[in-house]
């Protein structure tokens, strides 16, 4: 139970911190475990997704373009992310490293 509790509280703090670092505009790359690629309209390129590129819990979803650009390599998930770094939902194939 102790381990589960610490994981839960860690997930909660990541979720709450995501909104404070949500949008950096174009040209920003946070590496493979990016937790705030495209939150809000048009940040990081021309995407209009909300929450794309996943976070450390691998559960982010995107509604529309994620992380801008067309034909990138980091946004191939379909709603549930992939493993520890999750890659977000359906975006427009944008790359996290705009």
From Swiss-Prot:
Organism per entry: Dictyostelium discoideum (Social amoeba)
Recorded family membership: Belongs to the hssA/B family.
Region described as Disordered: 1-26, 60-98
Name of this protein: HssA/B-like protein 34
Biased composition (Gly residues): 60-72, 89-98
InterPro entries tied to this protein: HssA/B-related
Biased composition (Basic residues): 73-88
BP GO annotations: sorocarp development
A Pfam family of this chain: Coiled
């Amino acid at each position: 139970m102790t381990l589960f509790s610490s994981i839960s509280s860690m997930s909660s703090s990541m979720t709450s911190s995501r909104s404070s670092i949500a949008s950096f505009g174009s040209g920003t790359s946070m590496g493979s475990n990016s937790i705030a690629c495209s939150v809000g309209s048009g940040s990081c390129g021309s995407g209009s997704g909300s929450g794309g590129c996943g976070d450390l819990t691998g559960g982010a979803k995107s509604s529309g373009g994620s992380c801008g650009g067309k034909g990138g390599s980091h946004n191939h998930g379909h709603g549930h992310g992939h493993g520890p770094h999750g890659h977000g939902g359906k975006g427009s194939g944008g790359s996290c490293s705009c």
